[in-house]
Curated annotation (Swiss-Prot):
The keyword Transferase applies. Signal peptide: none annotated. Residues 494-503 have a biased composition (Polar residues). ATP binds at I673, G674, K675, G676, R677, F678, G679, Q680, V681, K789, D804. Residues 237-298, 489-559, 614-634 are annotated as: Disordered. Residues 260-274, 518-531 have a biased composition (Low complexity). This is Kinase suppressor of Ras 2. A zinc finger (Phorbol-ester/DAG-type) spans 413-457. Zn(2+) 2 binds at C426, C429, H447, C450. Phosphorylated on Ser-475 by MARK3. The active site is at D787.
């Protein structure tokens, strides 16, 4: 309380004119920087990207705070002490840039005619009348009023509001005009596909395809509405309001075209609703109309798309698929089917207030929602067709395969063991931890203090044939040790993957490990649950083949003798005896075809080099993905996600990246010290001298941003004396940079070519040993350099530092300056590439798709070893076409001209072996370098004369 009173008293204290000007100028510098970043995000980045939207919201709230601070500083100065310079703050032109007012309007308004303070004192109608005189349209007036309303609230509160109140609530439609979404005359192809495959789901009468008619001046926000279960089929009660935890945020001004653009998915305001059931009676009384029945947790899994009872922002668009159970009298038999009436909530016909809708549902999120729901599979709960049931009734057995049975839950205790991680997240509280506990059964990781709130262990009791006989099995598949198939964590099943931190898990929530997670196809119900065996499939249904069969499971092969037709692609829960593993087929290396250089080919623009590349097999792709994903944090199987065609984000990746994120405003960029394919390198300061590498990647490309984050994840775990020290990264587009320690000395490329420096055998061996140490460490961490050369190695007084490892994946996805029929080759790059990479070069093959491996890094080290003794690159005087042909066929330069010894040339030939399996590892290379004969001192050294005199 004392601190709050002190801050309030300081805010009320008057300021002198000089101090107020200093504070306003300081805040104005921050405003200029933030506005430039905001305009860059709005114009150069994709508006549909979630990361871009979040950054835009953050910058807008910061700017509101900055303008409020300028108003407060100006208010503390007495009126008689103010001068013209102070009256110029805050600047109206900068506020109009935030609102995205056209330049024509800005040029018409002069600072003497209108100020921001004048607009704050006006009403909305007066603001519109004033701005329309200068040529502003109604849409700009609506945005200006929304921004001024937010600034008034923040300024009146003195900045004590929450961060959510700083966000400007932008309107999405022009005031004064009615926005009636276009209603299609018939359902979309997506809906027709689902209706044709579901026998009892029919479209309603055309009057339900009615558009919403908002009142003039009210912004219309579209959202996928909820489903309700009603006792009367003709009533459309308004949906309940959203909880306070889900705050609706309208889009930014630059993102309004996304809302207006008609999506390729079905229109949001289209309603497809199965007809309702007859009114239900309970105790001879009808339920009052318009009263929604209470929800039931047991029936929530009947609807495709719901897997567990969790609440997260990433599943907010699935609120339209909720089904509530009516209060029916208790049945004597549990097998009696339940009658449900399902109201489709995709654009309900009633008028919903704007504050209850969420306009941030972009076209991409809606498209993923519709595409993710595939057609109803034959294993959907059967629909009864008896005469006593209405044609508009959907009957579902009580024990559907999608319903978890609570009576089979148990309270098995965890088998915890103490563990240590470099960086890990607690499953219960969502906070980071170094020391903690890990369950041996379900692999749950949490703090010691969180064990009391941890959910029960993931063990289930499964009925098998005779209900009296129970078989206990673990929830993880038997091939858990397979590096390609990693077990799913508890957070993957029940916690949203898009949130960096999650709240504590509800104790009453029963974990359902066998239910499909949020990334699986929600409309498929073919995965068998412990409560019921898999339903039989009709002969016409052709199930997909298993992804990764593992026949080495004797226990599960004995317990589960299910046909292979029920094996689906959710999770490998059961192993079936009739699944035969697919043998691996060796791939054939492509052939290099070198066309003769003629004038015709050059004039026609045809490529001088043509390389036939065969696609790699799926086994190699999965093996490469397994190597990349071997990190401290556990990820979902990448091959399984690609088979599902459903995007997914790892929650812990964002948490790890936050630890190394450095705001771009904190960096002091100095002079340019280097430039390469990855961008420019500047000498800068961030708590000392650092090297700032600005990554020059294309904008509006998710693949490049993901590749950059993957390399940052690889950088963060490197700590070695021969590897450059990673200090952090700027990961807020459009500013992407990697901050490392400043390397002293010169590059090995310049040292080798300096004739004044003597490189004898002892010095070259010492340099090579330092490089081998650093590369061996990177390979032990699972990191490939992919661009090892003398220009990426720094040498200073016998110390070697390796830089730029892993950045080749970022440069590989660059398309700037790339031509369709040209292969970009930098000087000195080809002699560092292994033959298997040379043979894959093609104008059509992207650089990040080249088959880099640990063996290719060893080949590049051989080129550096050659350069240390020859003081030049191999094949330097030859053209690129000749180098590609010679190195692709395994030819080597003439070593007799250099005068290498036998031991030195043997190391070079081992590194340059044509077959990559014959190349040694860096551990073996260290042994070979240590066995090199050391050069003794000359006999004319004074030490020898001293020894001879003693004799």
């Amino acid at each position: 309380m004392d601190e709050e009173n002190m801050t309030k008293s300081e805010e009320q204290q008057p300021l002198s004119l000089q101090k107020a000007l200093q504070q306003c100028e300081l805040v104005q510098n921050m405003i200029d920087l933030s506005i430039s970043n905001l305009e860059g995000l709005r114009t150069k980045c994709a508006a549909s990207n979630d990361l871009t939207q979040k950054e835009i919201r953050t910058l807008e709230s910061k700017l509101v705070k900055y303008f409020s601070r300028q108003l407060s500083c100006k208010k503390k100065v007495a009126l008689q002490e103010r001068n013209a310079e102070l009256d110029g703050f805050p600047q109206l032109r900068h506020w109009f840039r935030i609102v995205d007012v056209r330049k024509e309007v800005l040029e018409e308004i002069s600072p003497d005619q209108l100020s921001l303070e004048d607009l704050l004192e006006m009403t909305d109608e007066q603001v519109c009348e004033t701005v329309e005189k200068y040529g502003a349209n109604q849409e700009e007036c609506a945005r200006l009023n929304a921004s001024l309303s937010c600034l008034r609230n923040v300024h009146k509160s003195g900045g004590n509001l929450s961060k959510q109140d700083w966000i400007i609530q932008w309107p999405t439609t022009e005031p004064g005009q009615e926005s009636n979404p276009v209603c299609p005359p018939e359902p979309s192809p997506w809906i027709r596909t689902h209706l044709s495959q579901s026998p009892r789901v029919q479209t309603k009468c055309p009057q339900h395809f009615c558009p919403t008619s908002p009142t003039p001046g009210t912004p219309v926000y579209t959202q996928v509405d909820r489903l309700t279960v009603d006792a009367y089929p003709n009533l459309c009660p308004p949906p309940p309001p959203l909880e306070s935890g889900h705050r609706s945020l309208p889009p930014s001004p630059r993102q309004r075209h996304v809302v207006r653009t008609p999506p390729r998915t079905p229109n949001i305001v289209t309603t497809v609703t199965p007809p309702g059931t007859p009114p239900m009676r309970r105790k001879n009384k009808l339920k009052p109309p318009g009263t929604p029945p209470p929800s039931s947790r047991k029936l929530i899994h009947l609807i495709p798309g719901f897997t567990a009872l969790h609440r997260s922002k990433s599943h907010e668009f699935q609120l339209g698929n909720r089904v509530d159970e009516a209060n029916t009298p208790k049945a004597k038999k549990k097998s009696k089917p339940l009658n449900l009436k399902i109201h489709s909530g995709v654009g309900s016909c009633e008028n919903i207030p704007a504050q209850q809708r969420s306009p941030l549902l972009s076209e991409r999120s809606l498209r993923s929602f519709f595409v993710g729901h595939g057609p109803f599979l034959p294993s959907t709960p059967p629909v009864h067709t008896e005469a006593n049931f209405s044609a508009n009734t959907l009957s579902v057995p009580r024990w559907s395969p999608q319903i978890p049975r609570r009576d089979l839950g148990n309270s098995i205790k965890h088998r915890f063991s103490t563990k240590y991680w470099m960086s890990q997240t607690c499953t219960v509280c969502g906070k980071g931890m170094l020391f903690g506990l890990k369950c041996k059964n379900c692999k749950l990781k949490c703090h010691n203090k969180c064990t009391k709130e941890a959910p029960p262990c993931h063990l289930l009791i499964i009925h098998r044939g005779d209900p009296a006989r129970l078989v206990r099995t673990e929830s993880v598949p038997c091939d858990i040790n397979n590096p390609v198939r990693k077990p799913a964590r508890y957070s993957d099943l029940h916690i949203s993957q898009t949130l960096p931190k999650t709240n504590k898990i509800n104790k009453d929530h029963i974990p359902v490990p066998y239910q499909p997670d949020s990334s699986s196809n929600p409309s498929s119900t073919t995965s068998s649950t412990p409560s019921s065996p898999a339903p039989p499939l009709p002969p016409s249904a052709t199930p997909p083949s298993p992804l990764h069969p593992s026949p080495q499971c004797p226990r599960q092969k004995k317990n589960f003798n299910l046909p292979a037709s029920h094996y689906y692609k959710y999770k490998q829960q059961f192993i079936f005896p009739d699944v035969v593993p697919v043998p691996e087929t060796p791939t054939r290396a492509p052939q290099v075809i070198l066309h003769p250089v003629t004038s015709n080919t050059i004039l026609e623009g045809n490529p001088l080099l043509q390389i036939e590349v065969e696609p790699t097999s799926e086994n190699e792709e999965s093996h490469n993905e397994a190597e990349e994903s071997e990190d401290e944090f556990e990820e979902m199987n990448l091959s399984l996600l690609s088979a599902r065609s459903f995007p997914r984000k790892a929650s812990q990746t964002s948490i790890f990246l936050q630890e190394w994120d450095i705001p771009f405003e904190q960096l002091e960029i100095g002079e340019l010290i280097g430039k390469g394919r990855f961008g420019q390198v500047y000498h800068g300061r961030w708590h000392g001298e650092v090297a700032i590498r600005l990554i020059d990647i294309e904008r509006d490309n998710e693949d490049q941003l993901k590749a950059f984050k993957r390399e940052v994840m690889a950088y963060r775990q490197t700590r070695h004396e021969n590897v450059v020290l990673f200090m952090g990264a700027c990961m807020s587009p459009p500013h992407l940079a990697i901050i490392t320690s400043l390397c002293k000395g010169r590059t090995l490329y310049s040292v080798v070519r300096d004739a004044k420096i003597v490189l004898d055998v002892n010095k070259t061996r010492q340099i090579a040993q330092e490089i081998v140490k650093g590369m061996g460490y990177l390979h032990a961490k699972g990191i490939l350099h992919k661009d090892l050369k003398s220009k990426n190695v720094f040498y200073d007084n016998g110390k070697v530092v390796i830089t730029d490892f892993g950045l080749f994946s970022i440069s590989g996805v660059l398309q700037a300056g790339r031509r369709d029929d040209k292969l970009r080759i930098q000087n000195g790059w080809l002699c560092h590439l292994a033959p298997e990479i040379i043979r894959q070069l093609s104008p059509d093959t992207e650089e990040d798709k080249l088959p880099f491996s640990k063996h290719s890094d060893v080949f590049a080290l051989g080129t550096i070893w050659y350069e240390l003794h020859a003081r030049e690159w191999p094949f330097k005087t030859q053209p690129a076409e000749a180098i590609i042909w010679q190195m692709g066929t395994g030819m080597k330069p003439n070593l007799s001209q250099i005068g290498m010894g036998k031991e030195i040339s043997d190391i070079l030939l081992f590194c340059w072996a044509f077959e990559q399996e014959e190349r040694p590892t860096f551990t073996k290379l260290m042994d070979m370098l240590e066995k090199l004969p050391k050069r003794n001192r000359r006999l004319s050294h004074p030490g020898h004369f001293w020894k001879s005199a003693e004799l």
